[in-house]
Structure formats: structure tokens, C-alpha cells
């Protein structure tokens, strides 16, 4: 009989294939080298554009009537929501653009070396939910391709019972999308920018072509924009506006939280800012309008409102299964599938995979972590998000904001107000360093997050089942949670840091140990350029040398010396860590004792 230890041994990543030395340090955590910072305007535009040119954004306006707003008013709430998203996203991009680090190190900066596990766990959970939602829509896009290939598949009989909120075709498409998407995880995360650009461009032209065809065939855009009226009045209407703004931000909040993961690839702040702003204003406004036009024209053409573009193509093909209609369905289905696939791997699969690889390097690499996310996402039964009730969809999307907005608020406050955009990256790779706080946790950040998130939970429970209670104050707070929770967490964290200050001993690194900046950029930051650091000094600090072939050679050298990741996750000998602390030059003008750094005092 195979023992548990034997099973775990077989599941281990081979040592020569491990992408991690320890939970503290792995290639995906290190600041991006200057030569790999290749994401210009189009890459940054595509990262956010792919979120906009997606099926989820197309059908987003369908929720308008459920909250009592007209379609034009709903588009107005989305524009305001875009403005809010831009502010949050750009403010959260600084760790990536300033220090070329991603989400995980940003969590260490704010929540502490051990407290960062909390932020990682939250993002993994959010990634699983987001993965499930987008994979379901991606499966419907796969069916557009299959419908164009086979008349028999177009009319495939449903063999599932009515109690199941999906059909046989939907199951097939869902599984195929998972298989195709999983194949992408044999790529590396830094290679996806060109896929994002291609997918974004193809989907943009497909959506435009689809709308041009529908309006031409229907003789106009239809009457939905003018025929639907707002049913909410007075304060109810105001709160409906607030709710839709919160819903809109909540639906893209995972992307805002992930911003540092991709802003670190940026060639310049200008490329990051212009790409992000334009992508969040133009397509995120146009695509919901396309969805309304599609539903409006389908009333005249097919006798009912069809919000999902896949349903429109189904009627399209059933009405006329000609070569032209099949070609249109195929190319649109292909572009929509690419869009959903790109969105899924960039915002969910790779994000979760990197987090899990950093936590369990002995058993999980990025590929395994991403595949694990894909498998677990099926258990969420995402077909219920879309096929049962619009309230389910709204609740799922808005729940992202309830959990993530307080995290964003704390991160922005710590970065812009408390530390004023100054972080020591090398200290994030040491246990008892600058970010050890109290026992490895920054309790101020946790208090601020809990106090910002908790008030929105009763409202979310009410949204799921309004028979629990009917307290208007709680419901209204839930509607405006994206605003209220941000303000609560931001200012509470600020106050806690003023009343219980932590001591900043190392303002930022004195040398560019990672080659993340040009010589000129490093000097402007008060750092010795990477080109002027000796190989011996880099070796002493256990950082990749610019005179070697990089991290792989460093990893091999360390393993030969017998310093490998142990079962408790530690990869450094104690004398190396102490030596690093001793050699680190302190650049802050503030003073505090060594004990204050390791065990903060109140």
C-alpha cells in the first residue's frame, strides 16, 4: 500500500525544474530586469482592452432593468465607474512602475512577510471565481465555432434534465474551453502581451462588424434606448446609480489589484497611464452600448431580446445557414474565444499560478498552479451565474469589490501617504527585515481591511436572499460599498499608522541589485546603477549576477552548495541573512533600534 509520504514524494516538482528557491524568493518575485520591460502603449491598452472586449462586458447592461434604471442611465453609471476604476488602478500601479515588483511583493510591503499570505489567499480565491465565470462564457464562444462547422451540432438535442441550469452543448463547449486554455499554461507569463494585442484587435473588429450587420439588417439600432424608462425614483434612483457604479468597479477590481503584476513590464509611466486610461474609457463605454444595440435589433429580427452574442449567432445560423453566415459565425466565434481565453489566463490563471508557486514551491510551479485553478473553478458551477437569475450574476460581480476594495485602499494609503512611494525591495526577501512588523504581520493593515469589508457582508447576504431582513441602511451601504469601504479602510489605516507608527529604518535600496533600471534612472532614485555593482557583491547577497546567465545559474550554484528549499520554506543559511542585514547600507534619515525593526514597539 502506497504511503502518504510516497504520494507526496511523487508529486514533488523535480529539483532542476523548480521555479522557486523558497517562499521568500523566486524568479517571478524578483524585479523585472530593464531589458524585459517591453510593454508599451499597445500592450498596456490590450491588457485592459481585453477585459472590455469580452462577452461579460457586452452583456453588462442587461442588468439595468433589475435595478430600475434605463439603458442610457446605465451607460452613464458605467462611465462614472470607469473614472473610479482609473483612479484606483493608476494609484495601485506605482509599486510596479516605481520598483518593478508584482502583487506578491506589494503584499509583503503592506501586510508583512507572513501577513502577505492573506493577500495571496484572497487573490487565489478571487482568481478561481473569475476563472469560473469567464470559462463558462468562453465555452459558449467555442460553441459558435462548432455551430459554424456542423449543422447537426447547431441543432444538437439537449439530454440533460430541466433541473440543471445548462444544456448538453454548453457542457461540451465549457469542457473544450478548459482544455484549450490549459494548453496556454505551457507558455511563460511574460509572453502573453502579443496574444493580448491580437485578441483585443480581432474582437474589436468582430464586435464592430457584428453591430454594423445587425443595424443594417434591422434598419436601425432599435428602440431599447428610448423605449425603456427608469422605474426607480427619488432616493431609490440615486442608490441604484451608486449600486451600478459599485457593480461596474467590482467586476474589474481583480484587474486593478493585479495592476502591479503588469505595470512592472511597462516601458514608461506614460505608456502605462495612457494605455490604461484610454482602454478604460473608450471600449468599456462602447461595448455595453453594442450589447444594448444587439439586444434591441434582435427584438426586431428574432422576436426577443438576445443579450449574449452567442445567442444572436445561434438565431443567425438557424435563420440562414449559408456559407457567409457560417464564415461570420466562425471568425466572430474565434475572436471571442481568443478574447475570453486571454482574459482568463492573464487575470486568473497566471495570477493564481504565480501565487501558489511562491507558497508551495516544492509541489507547485506556475503551470500546476494555473491548472489547479482551472480544475477547482468547475466546482463553482458558473452556469448558475448566468442561467438562473440576474441577481446571481450581480452578486458574484459585486462581491469582488467588497473583498478587494479595502485591500486596494490599504495598499494605496501605505504607498502614497505613509511611505511616499519608497520601498526597499531587498528587505522583502528577508524574514526579519523592514517588513517583519510584529511577528511578520502588519496588524494595522488587517484591522483596516476587516473594518472596511465587514459592513458590506450583510448587504451581500440580503442580495442572495432578501428574506433574511429588510434594513434599508444596510442595503444602501452595500450598494455604495466600493466608495464606503475604500474611505473606511484608507483613513482607518492612516489613523492607525499615526497613532501606532512603525519605524522605517531603510527607506529604499542603496543599489540596483536586480538591474531593473537604467543607469540614469538608478541615479535619480539615489541608487548605485546595476552596471557598477561587482559580481562578488551580487554573489554575497545571493542575487543573480549580470555576468552569469541569470537566475538559473544562480539556482544551480546554490543547490551545489547544499542550500536548497527545506520543508519549512527557508532557503538561506542564517549567517547569509545576518550578513545581508549587516552589509545593507541604511539610507533613511530616521533612526530606530535593530529590535524595533524585528519586533516593532508600539
Each model region followed by its residue ranges:
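Membrane-interface loop-to-helix entry segments
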Residues: 133-139, 172-217, 224-226, 276-280, ...
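Membrane-water interface regions at transmembrane-helix termini and the short interhelical loops
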Residues: 66-68, 93-95, 110, 118, ...
